[in-house]
Amino acid sequence: MIIGTGYSLENFTVLEHNKVIDQSGFIHLFGQIRNISNETLKTVTAHANFYDKGGHNIGNASGITSLRSLNIGEVSPFEIVFLDKNQTNQFFNYTLNFTSEIGHNKPDNLVITSLKSRPDIFGYYYVSGRISNNGNDTATNVLAIASFFDNNSRMIGLSSAIAEPSNMTSHSISSFTVVMDDKIQSSKIKNFSLLIDSDQYTSR
């Protein structure tokens, strides 16, 4: 697996990337990137080109990072889904590239105050908890984002859920439950990481 070159990579470091085939036969590329530029970046999009063993392009896909913007030094997971199942067996390699726009810094005023996780008897994996808005402004469209890892610390899943309530006034509390519903991968989960995002704030 290789990572493409280009101007956009001057703004990011790819911390990891991994390919997974889901229970329906679709290829997912999971990964994490860090903003190494000197400014906040928004609308960060991961682009992938897919190749067969002969180096021929068999398709492309893209996906927006889970965080709506990345402060300087901040890390976000991403997911790209290749929807052409007819090419799954031909897949051999891929390249990654990233595009972004200049954004505005988000304070880290969303705090995870409780957290627990568990698998269920049906093969799903749940991550739930509570969030506090420690900022002075209302946080809108609050989202909990969970990245899942296997025994080898490879990223094997990414899922998110809107908090309840999704708009949090100053110093209020919301709850969330994120579900990992790919049963093939959920049985391999060894660890996870969690981020909270909103239009105004991010988590610590």
Model-identified regions with their sequence ranges:
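Short aromatic-acidic-glycine turn motif
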Residues: 50-59, 148-158
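Proline/serine/threonine-rich low-complexity linkers at boundaries of modular beta-sandwich domains
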Residues: 2-11, 101-108
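Short, solvent-exposed loop/turn segments enriched in Ser/Thr/Gly
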Residues: 24-30, 121-128
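Hydrophobic beta-strand segments
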Residues: 45-48, 63, 143-146, 161
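Asparagine-centered strand-capping/turn motif at beta-strand->loop junctions
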Residues: 33-38, 131-135
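Intrinsically disordered, low-complexity Pro/Gly/Ser/Thr-rich segments with frequent PxxP/GP/PP motifs
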Residues: 58-86, 157-185
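Short acidic/proline- and small/hydrophobic-mixed sequence motifs that coincide with surface turns
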Residues: 40-43, 58, 91, 138-141, ...
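Terminal connector regions
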Residues: 83-124, 181-204
